């Protein structure tokens, strides 16, 4: 299917509606009292490297620099990691590299990034490697005494940012991470609260809804995109077709853009910034899957069982109408010249050619369905997802996978292979994935999930709001 995004399309009224909904949600949150946190037991004592001058003494005493030193005692009563990593700065001094949000050190609040550590349990840290020092802190039980010079730089307020992961990540398999135990494992689609972005390569985050309160290290978008780009194959394989029009010859014309899968090959995904909105109605149901997976059966069942709720936008075509066909019902019949003009005017969200005839779905047809307060069903090529995934169309995207039961015929194996190719490239767009073992079961799960999405708070791309 040849694809073309409509450059003239904008967010429209739906964008305004979601923006207003988000603003109202923020105002309601502002009126709620903030939670109070209680630090762990810790003892601190201040002193100075040139004796004990009174507070407010000059920074220089007889040519010596006055440096405030703090003695910190931390009671470590469990096997819980301290949630801290160390590094050597440019002066080869041992400093705090990062503090994991929610960890032991973060909760008791006595250490900060950039603090210089002079002694651990009375032992001078000079001539000790970072690995040796971290091991000593990890293995110590009971009271840990640290002598530190506090970092005097101002500290930034906590971040309020949420990202949807667009790839799977396991820190145990990452050779770049500075500390595998400090890494955060997550899967595509997980919502990650970003706690700290000070390190350009390693951010700190926490999976939303997880029982684990402490944060972990995740690769920054820049690091992940560099990693993927550096190992990407020079010629990625073309994604299989899942178009309702079947396998089509590509229609090539001076008015048509190149197939957007070319641009997909250049896209390197990592994270997508999202915001949480109160419940709102999804306006479009999008079905994605390999050709032959059963999307047409599912679509037709939804249309026949819920005609007052779902509508399929009739495609436009240059094919001559058959005797039993009525213009505007199954298809809109137009001339090749008119369709070419419409394509040039960016009126189609998707178009292509099959057996010498052109087919396509117009934005306006979908808009008319929305104006009737009904839900448009689209079964489109996966390359079109980036075009329809907007606040204006507000889609709920469902990936239909082939059955994993029964005899593994050659045809089924090929279908599973095609399906996996689509999933691996476009999974970060999916709101729901279903295995189509039974059409009735798939329909039930799909409708339940769709209704749940429309009646519950939802994470949506920040571009839908701003």
Swiss-Prot record:
SUBUNIT field: Heterodimer with PALS1. Interacts with DLG5 and NF2. Interacts (via guanylate kinase-like domain) with WHRN (via third PDZ domain).
- Residue span of region Interaction with PALS1: 268-466
Q: Which GO terms describe its molecular function?
A: transferase activity
> What is the primary gene name for this protein?
MPP1
- Specify the protein name: 55 kDa erythrocyte membrane protein
Per UniProt, subcellular location reads as: Cell membrane; Cell projection, Stereocilium
Domain PDZ residue range list: 71-152
Q: Looking at the UniProt record for this protein, which Gene Ontology cellular component terms does it annotate, in alphabetical order? A: centriolar satellite; cortical cytoskeleton; plasma membrane; stereocilium
Organism per entry: Papio anubis (Olive baboon)
Share the record's PTM remark.
Answer: Palmitoylated.
The taxonomic lineage of its organism, from the top, reads:
Eukaryota, Metazoa, Chordata, Craniata, Vertebrata
* One Pfam family from the record: Guanylate_kin
Keywords, comma-separated and alphabetical = Acetylation, Cell membrane, Cell projection, Lipoprotein, Membrane, Palmitate, Phosphoprotein, SH3 domain, Transferase
């Amino acid at each position: 299917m040849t694809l073309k995004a409509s450059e003239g399309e904008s967010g429209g009224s739906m964008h305004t509606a979601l923006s207003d909904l988000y603003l109202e949600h923020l105002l309601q949150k502002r009126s709620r009292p903030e939670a109070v946190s209680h630090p762990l037991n810790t003892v601190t004592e201040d002193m100075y490297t040139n004796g004990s001058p009174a507070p407010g003494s000059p920074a220089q005493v007889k040519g010596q620099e006055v440096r405030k030193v703090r003695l910190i005692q931390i009671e470590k009563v469990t096997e819980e990691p301290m949630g801290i990593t160390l590094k050597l700065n440019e002066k080869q001094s041992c400093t705090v590299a990062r503090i994991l949000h929610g960890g032991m050190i973060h909760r008791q609040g006595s250490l900060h990034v950039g603090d210089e550590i002079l002694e651990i349990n009375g032992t001078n840290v000079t001539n000790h490697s970072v690995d040796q020092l971290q091991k000593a802190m990890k293995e110590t039980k009971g009271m840990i005494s640290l002598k530190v010079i506090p970092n005097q730089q101002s500290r930034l307020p906590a971040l309020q940012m949420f990202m949807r992961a667009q790839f799977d990540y396991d820190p145990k398999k990452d050779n770049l991470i500075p500390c595998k135990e400090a890494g955060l494992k997550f899967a595509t689609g997980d919502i990650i609260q970003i706690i700290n972005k000070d390190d350009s390569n390693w951010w700190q985050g926490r999976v939303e809804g997880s029982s684990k309160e402490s944060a972990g290290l995740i690769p920054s978008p820049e690091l992940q995109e560099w990693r993927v780009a550096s190992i990407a194959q020079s010629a990625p394989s073309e994604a299989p077709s899942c178009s309702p029009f079947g396998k089509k010859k590509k229609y090539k014309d001076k008015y048509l853009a190149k197939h957007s899968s070319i641009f997909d090959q250049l896209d390197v995904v990592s994270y997508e910034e999202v915001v949480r909105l109160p419940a709102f109605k999804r306006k479009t149901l999008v079905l994605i899957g390999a050709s032959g997976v059963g999307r047409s059966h599912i679509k037709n069942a939804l249309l026949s069982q819920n005609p007052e709720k779902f509508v399929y936008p009739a495609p436009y075509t240059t094919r001559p109408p058959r005797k039993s066909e009525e213009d505007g019902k199954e298809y809109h019949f137009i001339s090749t010249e008119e369709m070419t003009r419409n394509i040039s005017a960016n009126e189609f969200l998707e178009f292509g050619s099959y057996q010498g005839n052109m087919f396509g779905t117009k934005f306006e047809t979908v808009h008319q369905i929305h104006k009737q307060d009904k839900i448009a069903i689209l079964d489109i090529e996966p390359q079109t997802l980036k075009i329809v995934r907007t606040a204006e169309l507000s889609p709920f995207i469902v990936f239909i996978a082939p059955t994993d039961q029964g005899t593994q015929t050659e045809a089924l194996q090929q279908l599973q292979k095609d399906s996996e190719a689509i999933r691996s490239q476009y999974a970060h767009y999916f709101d729901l994935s279903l295995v189509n073992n039974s059409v009735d079961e798939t329909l039930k799960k799909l409708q339940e999930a769709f209704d749940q999405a429309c009646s519950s708070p939802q994470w949506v791309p920040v571009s839908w709001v701003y």
